[in-house]
């Protein structure tokens, strides 16, 4: 790596409040649901926990950051665009205001669309944080290059992550440990962008056969996964003979075309970049954040029998109602 050339820049943001939109979100199974979604401080889900089948939509584990400052020059959202661009997976994050001042965590991913940077903290720290607390990130990773593997592009990855990940070179091929393979054909929301530096794109889980074949029901926050036939150098693209390795950053979704989000980390031709199966290839293990819970397979929320909402009762005719004494 070109470690001597890299520049470390402090960037920051505030803990984002959850956003309220339409009261219901209609799932790809036709069922409307009311669920927690993006933003806020998620107290009981963090890196290493399952991300499929939760009673939530696009759940962001740990803390979601944005920067709502306004600059006198450039676009109005310039500070937040810089935050989501500069921050890289594995960067150190430090709380600089509020009761948790001085506590540290780690950047675990970026969520495009809502444009949040996600940070993991220990549970006892999460409960001391407040909405609006400021967090500063020691960003390092922009401009990172693999000098011995120029055909492979590094994106959104800190040098610390690549040093800890146990990447192995054999016969000129870089082997990257991953928990799952994902076919590029089922990637959804996030396609159509001209950069892969500012977010993620989603794995669709609606097809049960594909889900079972690739064991996608067992995905966890922080899992390293390989998207096969995908080139992310200049935005997410389907390209045969290429592979993109990334990290699961947010949870499943009931919305059509959406699902667990992947922030790209490495992208290159398969003859130079090769995924290898490693059940514990998760940020929780790579950085020693916590013991990794056993992987179990879960069904997505959409497609399950409706429980308490969303199921329309069979209409009752006036004649039947009269016979029952209702008229």
Regions found by a protein language model. Give the residues of each.
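Epigenetic methyl-mark regulator signature
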Residues: 1-2
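Conserved mixed alpha/beta catalytic, RNA-binding, or beta-rich assembly cores of soluble enzyme
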Residues: 7-303
């Amino acid at each position: 790596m070109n470690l001597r050339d890299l520049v470390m820049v402090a960037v920051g943001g505030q803990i984002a409040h959850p956003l309220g939109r339409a009261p219901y979100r209609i799932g790809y199974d036709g069922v409307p649901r009311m669920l927690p979604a993006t933003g806020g401080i998620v107290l009981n889900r963090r890196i290493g926990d399952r991300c499929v089948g939760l009673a939530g939509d696009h759940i962001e584990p740990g803390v979601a950051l944005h920067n709502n400052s306004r600059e006198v020059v450039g676009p109005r959202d310039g500070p937040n665009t810089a935050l989501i661009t500069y921050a890289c997976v594995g960067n150190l994050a430090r709380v600089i205001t509020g009761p948790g001042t001085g506590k540290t965590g780690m950047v675990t991913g970026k969520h495009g669309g809502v444009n949040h940077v996600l940070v993991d903290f220990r549970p006892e720290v999460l409960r001391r944080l407040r909405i609006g607390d400021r967090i500063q990130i020691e960003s390092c990773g922009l401009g990172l290059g693999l000098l011995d593997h120029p055909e492979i592009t590094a994106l959104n990855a800190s040098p610390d992550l690549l040093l800890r990940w146990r990447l192995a070179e054999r016969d000129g091929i870089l082997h990257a440990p991953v928990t799952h393979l994902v076919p590029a054909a089922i990637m959804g929301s996030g396609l159509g962008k001209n950069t892969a530096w500012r977010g993620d794109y989603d794995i669709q889980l609606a097809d049960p056969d594909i889900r079972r074949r690739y064991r996608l029901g067992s995905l966890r926050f922080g899992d390293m996964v390989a998207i096969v036939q995908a080139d992310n150098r200049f935005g997410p693209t389907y390209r045969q003979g290429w592979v993109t390795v990334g990290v699961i950053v947010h949870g499943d979704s009931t919305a059509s075309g959406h699902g667990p989000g992947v922030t790209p980390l490495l992208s290159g031709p398969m003859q130079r970049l090769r995924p290898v199966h490693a059940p514990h290839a998760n940020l929780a293990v790579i950085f020693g954040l916590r013991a990794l819970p056993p992987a179990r397979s879960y069904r997505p929320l959409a497609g399950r029998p409706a429980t308490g909402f969303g199921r329309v009762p069979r209409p009752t005719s006036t004649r039947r109602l009269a016979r029952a004494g209702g008229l």
